[in-house]
């Protein structure tokens, strides 16, 4: 039977991608249905209890700048906040927060249940309704059918999921949850390329059985960082430390002696695992010269005794896991409360997607999260938001939107996936972006909030705060430009005390702030340039914009030059055999990838600069040289 009301957008799956997709579509005014196999696990942190990190924190800030949920949720649930790379430049500084799993899940569920235009329904989905190469709905486990103009698949590791502990394995979406086998079979019937990937998680330890007195503590930062541009530190719950231990030669011997019982090394697991979050057995074998690996003991929450040992993800048998854990300092008497495991699951080639994350083959069907070959909550959330907003736009008969590589890490993520694809779980790093100085955590709102407002994602409260911040930045920069001090002025001695070389000529506040030894806080502590802005976010922007002005201007010039060709569109139906002068290899790759633009084509392995020049000349001759806005 059909449900009585049709929807504009259906989201299948309630993880980090699904919740952002549902919130985005509903915020844009579309009637949205979120289908999940269990309402109690909405926003569940299936692996590590943390949000953010290098590259990942940038994505969270971008999701927040577009009105998303993740940053707000972690501000309410974070039990330790730190800025990574704090001593380095602003481009690579990144926020990371340890999370209380229960508080995080509660924050997500509360937001979803109070979002207008959003209905949540508990039922596993087993089928899609596809008519004339367009998706028009979904069918649940009990045969209930829902109609919609667009469907977003955010199913995580559930598609034909298989859990491995030692040489034993069983079907599962994650520990304690069933897999989605009928939906996996249905998707394999569609004209989509599918492969298998693998990820894993470490055993969880009972904190009461760890001797923390012999371990180094790691505390959060003070003052505490905040994730959301709308947040403040007063929202954070109680803060707690993490602890550090290490593997040792005894640990490594245990692992080496039991490799024949590892499903990965015994050839039982076919899927490829994450390069940048390898299992402990993988680390020991790949880095054989290392006699120890650092392990972070992270609390799972304020009301839980479980500890997450970050760094020993494993699928070795339980008895071996016990030996590994007890070989480390402070863990000699530790007890495991949940065994570690590996999980294999289906993923679909993201090169079959448009930059909007809509399928090239099934109209109205969108993919986001681990189903696209990524790993990580943050990567999933960013894709979920993009897929959700584009599903909403499609259901309203509007053109899709995707950020450029020069505009956001989300743009880098989507372009990498849709252009290059991936053979292993993809995670974000700042090194993946060409224009890191422009794509900082601190300016995510300046880059994206205006677009978020145009798209209908940003509410009035966030918009007012954003404009207030812009005004504060502009007003303060004008004040510093127009406030001067001369070498003979009474205030010169106070200024010179902060400078490595004294004033030799008249200088404005901005001139002084450009000096590497002068900070905004120091400058505005001087009588001549007081007071400082109360708006800390605006003050940070003033300092960065002034100090890095020349570098930023140079990078902006590079972006503008690159964009002239980057945005040149390539016809979706073009058969590249028509373009004379291209090699057979280039023709095959272009016909296989079907890039949407010259920029995408240029990033395909094997497509040379000479081939790009030939394409541009051919497009001009054919009168097909068009650029996207």
UniProtKB/Swiss-Prot annotation:
Q: What InterPro entries does UniProt report for this protein, alphabetically?
A: FAD/NAD-bd_sf, GIDA_C_N, MnmG, MnmG-rel, MnmG-rel_CS, MnmG_C, MnmG_C_subdom, MnmG_C_subdom_sf
User: Highest taxon of the source?
Assistant: Bacteria
Keywords, ordered alphabetically: Cytoplasm, FAD, Flavoprotein, NAD, tRNA processing
Work out whether the entry's keyword set contains Nucleotidyltransferase: no
Indicate which residues the UniProt annotation says bind FAD: 13-18, 125, 180, 370
The biological process GO terms on file are: tRNA methylation; tRNA wobble uridine modification
- Record's keyword annotation contains tRNA processing: yes
**Known Pfam families for this protein?**
GIDA, GIDA_C_1st, SAM_GIDA_C
Entry cofactors: FAD
Extract one GO cellular component term from the record. Answer: cytosol
Gene3D superfamilies, per the entry: FAD/NAD(P)-binding domain (3.50.50.60), GidA associated domain, C-terminal subdomain (1.10.150.570), tRNA uridine 5-carboxymethylaminomethyl modification enzyme MnmG/GidA (1.10.10.1800)
Q: In which compartments does the protein localize?
A: Cytoplasm
Where does it mainly reside? cytoplasm
PANTHER family, from UniProt? GLUCOSE INHIBITED DIVISION PROTEIN A, PROTEIN MTO1 HOMOLOG, MITOCHONDRIAL
Give the function comment from the record.
NAD-binding protein involved in the addition of a carboxymethylaminomethyl (cmnm) group at the wobble position (U34) of certain tRNAs, forming tRNA-cmnm(5)s(2)U34.
- Which family, according to the similarity comment? Belongs to the MnmG family.
Mind telling me what this protein is named?
Answer: tRNA uridine 5-carboxymethylaminomethyl modification enzyme MnmG
Originating organism: Salmonella paratyphi B (strain ATCC BAA-1250 / SPB7)
